[in-house]
Amino acid sequence: MKKIKLENTNEVLYYDKLDNGLEVYMLPNNNVNKFYLTLNTRFGSINTKFKFDNKEYDMPKGIAHYLEHLSFNMEDGSVFDHYSKIGSSINAFTTYDITSYNVTSNNRFKENLEYLLEYVYTPYFTKELFQSEKGVIEEEVKMYKDDPGMTIVNGTLNNVFVNDERKYLVGGTVKDVKSIKLEDVITCYDAYYNPKNMFLIITGNFNPNEALAITSEQMNKLNINNDFNVKDIYPKEPE
């Protein structure tokens, strides 16, 4: 495990890369009560065109955001319900190039971290859950479209870029959402939710040696396939 001293703050950043490729960044601060867990994949709204398993794909816009929504389900119930019972707060967000899953708590560090890794790396995608979430996402997309700030940002990017996917809304349009299929979501998950394409960030009150041991042990239990063979296809901007 590498230690990197941050001169400006007099803190130490710990870094390690597990055998399966998952990168772990840890910044402990024992002056606070809470800890923050963030599991991230380098998959966002711009990653709609790619080559995976020797086949090219052109996915609907907003699919990364759709996948994020579906990730909060396990076979035994809702991820939100599980974390609520142990007093933890969770959230997630999708940007142009990253999807992030977050947990905040002040106790039961091991359980919080283990479950974060478990639910993200063992998806439960069913036709029923996929269909029920579609309406929720459509309403969210409509809400963003009515937001003045989002409208200004999107309008600006729409004028800045010609072909770049950043000119489009992260969640896509209602039409985009309607066009997304369950098999599309599964393909994107298999392609991008790979330890070699992901990184874990832990900050706050925790022990970095303990955190790394828990992460390594849990990833070994989950036995995730880390054969990463995605090649992104980005449209070129005119010079």
Labelled PLM ranges:
Residues 1-79, 186-239:
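His/Glu-rich zincin catalytic helix
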